[in-house]
């Protein structure tokens, strides 16, 4: 029997702002409570640090008001597979506006924590490789999904024929451009397959997981733009409805 080596990797470094729709609301609340308007980008233009505080306050209130209206609109429309083209266009337009609004508010922090994340994942990557090289089986006990980058890439570095099964209601297949919130823990599977080509995998020179060898099991809450990434890559998704319909055993057979 192969020895199991347990790797403790508890972290929440991938978190940027909390949750999907909640993330946008958090940014709004942060903006409302902020007295330093030059921390933000308003209407696409950086505010001068020495600009008039009264003018800044008016700009902030105006922007927040529009942003609040946008959030209210978002709660009135939800993406459904049976939407007609007009309804889908309306949803995508609102989602696009929300993405722009969030990134405008938080543009200076778009890739926050990258240095710490990369340092952590590189250590985890090397540890995973060492465990496998020693003939042991790595069992990772980790924090948020960002730890999957170091462990999965370390594994495929030692076994180039590996596939990856992602048990999650989320696909974690976002990219920087498609992520609404900027939560980096929504990118790991895209990084592991090199769909998201970013510095999150700079410590690894390949190989990456083949799209055809990547399977998502339990998907039920996938962003519309993220769905576009999944479909573009050709990654297989078994939804919660598929599990109910076919059963866990059959889904596992199909996944393998």
What are these regions (language model features)?
Residues 2-6, 12-256:
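Conserved alpha-helical scaffold segments that buttress catalytic/binding sites
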């Amino acid at each position: 029997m192969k020895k199991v080596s347990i790797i403790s990797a508890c972290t929440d470094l991938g978190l940027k702002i909390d949750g999907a729709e909640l993330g946008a609301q958090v940014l709004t609340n942060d903006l409302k409570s902020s007295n330093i308007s030059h921390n933000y980008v308003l209407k696409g233009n950086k505010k001068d640090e020495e600009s008039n505080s009264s003018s800044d306050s008016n700009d902030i209130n105006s922007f927040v008001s529009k942003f609040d209206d946008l959030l209210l609109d978002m709660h009135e429309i939800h993406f459904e597979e049976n939407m007609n083209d007009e309804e889908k266009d309306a949803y995508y337009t609102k989602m696009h506006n929300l993405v722009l609004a969030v990134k405008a508010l938080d543009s200076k922090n778009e890739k926050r924590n990258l240095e710490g994340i990369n340092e952590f994942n590189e250590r985890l990557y090397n540890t995973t490789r060492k465990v496998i090289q020693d003939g042991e089986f790595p069992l990772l006990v980790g924090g948020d999904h960002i730890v999957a980058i170091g462990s999965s890439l370390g594994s495929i570095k030692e076994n180039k024929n590996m596939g990856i099964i992602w048990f999650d209601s989320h696909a974690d297949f976002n990219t920087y451009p498609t992520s609404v919130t900027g939560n980096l823990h929504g990118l790991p599977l895209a990084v592991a397959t090199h769909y998201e080509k970013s510095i999150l995998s700079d410590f690894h020179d390949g190989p990456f997981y083949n799209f055809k060898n990547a399977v998502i099991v339990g998907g039920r809450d996938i962003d519309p733009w993220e769905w576009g990434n999944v479909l573009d890559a050709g990654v297989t998704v078994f939804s919660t409805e598929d599990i109910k319909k076919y059963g866990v055993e059959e889904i596992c057979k199909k996944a393998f």
